[in-house]
Amino acid sequence: MDKVGATSFTAATEKDWEIAVRQGRQRYIADAGVAALNLLKSQKDEPSNGWQVNNYEHSLSAATKALRNGEDEEYVVAVLLHDLAQDLDPMRHDRVAGTLMKPFLRPENHWMVANHQVFQLGFRTHSKFDTKACEKFRGHPFFEHTLRFCDLYDQSCFDPNAERLAIATFEPMVRRVFGRVMQARMTSYP
Ligand SMILES: [Fe+2]
Ligand SMILES: [Fe+2]
């Protein structure tokens, strides 16, 4: 990799900019999705807060079930990464994950990730929160899509004996889903 001599933006020559921008774009495309995967992997050995699986295992279990059920690749990726922001902001981790993944997901999958917490509440039999809170969204075009996700792949994926494929199984999928959009973004800038 070429390195420029400048140590500030103001000192960088036109050639420096050409080198740094070109190499940056190539790397962003080559490594698309890796930052999201790394965030998920950072949860690998974290405590489970009393559940029988931790958040990382829950995520792998959910993605494995989605894959086995024949869901499409982008949906499997959305399932895998739906809780990647759990530790950043537990009470609004869906919004944070949704913001991170918005450019890379279809609208229905983005909305599903970004709003899953309020739908997940509907499956709780014990809660001080309003378990019917998702009703405010009834009629929304992605209501049923999100409810189905929470039922099939979120509330029901905390079993330590459920199949969990290795993260390596999903890495190429994440790279493809993020890479498609990254490629388009990087080549659309002047
Ligand atoms: Fe969640
Ligand atoms: Fe979850």
Task: State the predicted function of each range.
Residues M1-L80, L84-P190:
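Metal-dependent phosphohydrolase cores
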